[in-house]
Structure formats: C-alpha cells, structure tokens
C-alpha cells in the first residue's frame, strides 16, 4: 500500500503530465519562497501565514523523501525526513499564534532554511553547476587516493540517470545544460570510479557526495545573521566552506578505500560500503560539523545566541 501523501503527489503529477520528482521540487521551491517572504517581509500582515505555509511545504518535501531512504535502508535519514512534516506543521501553527512574540532565534532559523535551500536548489537545477560539483568531488577524491598511495584509480566518463528511463553516458544526453528541463533519476549526474586497468570499483560519485548539504547548512546559518555586517559573514563563509570540502574529500577517500579493500566484510548484515557511508561517515560528519560550529562561534558570537 502506497503512503497517502505520496499517492496524492503522484495523482497531481499525473494530472499535470509531469514526474513526481518535479512536483516535489515545486513544493520545495514554493516553501522556500514563502519562508523567504516571512523572513524578509516580516512586518507585513501576511508574513505569518506565508511562513506557516512555508514550514509546512518544506516539511512535506522532506517527508516525501523518506520512502527513498526506507528503500536504501538508511534509518537515520528515515527518522529525520519522516519527522519533518509534523515538525513543520507544528512550527507553522506556532508562527501564526506567536508572530509578534517570536524570539530572534526563530526569525534567524526561518532565514537559515531559506538561504540553505536557495543555493542547493540552484546547483541542482542548473546542470552545469550540478555536473561541476560532481566532477570536482570525484577528481579531488581520486587525486587524494593517488597521492596517499592507496591505489591507482581513474574516473570513468560521466553518466546521467534519467527518470524512469535508465542510465546513459553524458555524451548521449541531449538535455538542456543550463536549466533542468527534465527530472533525473536517483543518481542524477554521476561518475563511476575505476581502477587504472579499467576494472570497476563499486563506488560512484553523485551530487550528494559533494558535501553540498553540509555546506548549505552553514551558508544558511551565516547569511541569515542579518544584524551582522557582510564582511564578517563572508570571512566566516571563506573559512567554513573550504574546510568542509577538504574534510569531505578525506571522507570520500576513506569510503572508497575501505569498500574496495574489504569487499567481504560484514557487520550485522551490513557490507563495508553501507556501514561506512550510512553510519560511520554520517556520525563523523556530524562531529566535524559540531567542531566547525564551535570555531564559528568565536568569529560570530551572534550565531551562538541563536542556537
């Protein structure tokens, strides 16, 4: 039995003649826009209702992703995405009832979500940027593996996972390179990794491997500090984003090396890739983000007051 909200989205997409993924992206965009209205135009009478709709839409968008994480057996993200909808609804109701008494931390969080979603949406929706992030991630990881003497690897030609069609080489894709005019499959643009002799490694690089999600959390948190001068915010961004990228390259290299060298390893039914990618690397990333936040609190004490 299909989940009711996913079924409703499917019915809407069928009536519009577009893919489910496109409707979900429209929900995300609408949520970001209405939250942005609530953040940047919060003195207007309609701002609380706009924010309430935005929280609900963003919660619904994340909730609709939970089915995918159930399929790939990622319990951490299942819990986080499934809980987003009730939390979003609760925040929307609270916004309407307590708009004039809303603490500055909630106002900041509203802007944080907006300015985290906007850059991710742009990167995802502009194929050239999307492919650029994927290529940079794969190339940097390959270079680190080679430099550290952990093996001889090479990048295979970039592939495109088309929604409902399958995977084809990028050279055969005739889609628009500047505007995403068609939905992509689960992997989107991706680069398989190979050994130097051409044998395939069971790891590919997709947009999610670029740590873009981690970067946009800090982008949103820093940009939303509207009371802080831009020069201080830019300095914090220049420190946070390159650091996240470098740490992510080490993370990816570790996952590749462990997966490639411990093929038969299992722990409670999990293979090496599933264990490192879904558990070890996630908890390691959360710890690294925690340390990053502590460092940023020294640069931006205002950020600490909102968290």
Where on the chain are the PLM-derived regions?
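Hydrophobic N-terminal alpha-helices or hydrophobic patches in metabolic proteins across all domains
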Residues: 1-307
């Amino acid at each position: 039995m299909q989940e009711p909200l996913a079924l409703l989205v499917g019915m809407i997409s069928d009536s519009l003649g577009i893919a489910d993924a496109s409707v979900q992206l429209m929900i995300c965009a609408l949520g970001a826009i209405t939250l942005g209205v609530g953040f940047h135009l919060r003195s207007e009478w309609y701002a609380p209702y706009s924010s309430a709709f935005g929280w609900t839409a963003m919660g619904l968008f994340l909730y609709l992703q939970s089915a995918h994480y159930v399929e790939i057996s990622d319990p951490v993200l299942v819990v986080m995405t499934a809980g987003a909808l009730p939390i979003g609804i609760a925040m929307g109701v609270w916004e309407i009832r307590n708009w004039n008494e809303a603490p500055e931390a909630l106002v900041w969080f509203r802007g944080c979500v907006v300015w985290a979603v906007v850059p991710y949406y742009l990167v995802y929706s502009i194929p050239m940027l999307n492919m650029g992030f994927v290529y940079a991630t794969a190339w940097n990881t390959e270079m680190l593996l080679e430099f550290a003497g952990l093996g001889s690897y090479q990048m295979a030609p970039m592939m495109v996972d088309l929604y409902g069609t399958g995977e084809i080489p990028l050279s055969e894709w005739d889609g628009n390179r500047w505007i995403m005019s068609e939905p992509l499959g689960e992997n989107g643009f991706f680069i398989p990794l190979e050994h130097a002799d051409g044998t395939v490694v069971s790891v590919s690089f997709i947009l999610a491997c670029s740590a873009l999600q981690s970067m946009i959390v800090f982008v949103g948190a820093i940009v939303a500090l509207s009371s802080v001068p831009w020069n201080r915010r830019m300095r914090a961004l220049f420190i946070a984003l390159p650091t996240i990228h470098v740490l992510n390259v080490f993370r990816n290299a570790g996952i590749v090396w462990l997966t490639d060298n411990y093929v038969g390893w299992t722990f409670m039914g999990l293979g090496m890739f599933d264990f490192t990618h879904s558990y070890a690397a996630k908890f390691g990333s959360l710890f690294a983000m925690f340390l990053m936040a502590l460092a940023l609190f020294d640069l931006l004490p205002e950020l600490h007051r909102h968290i």
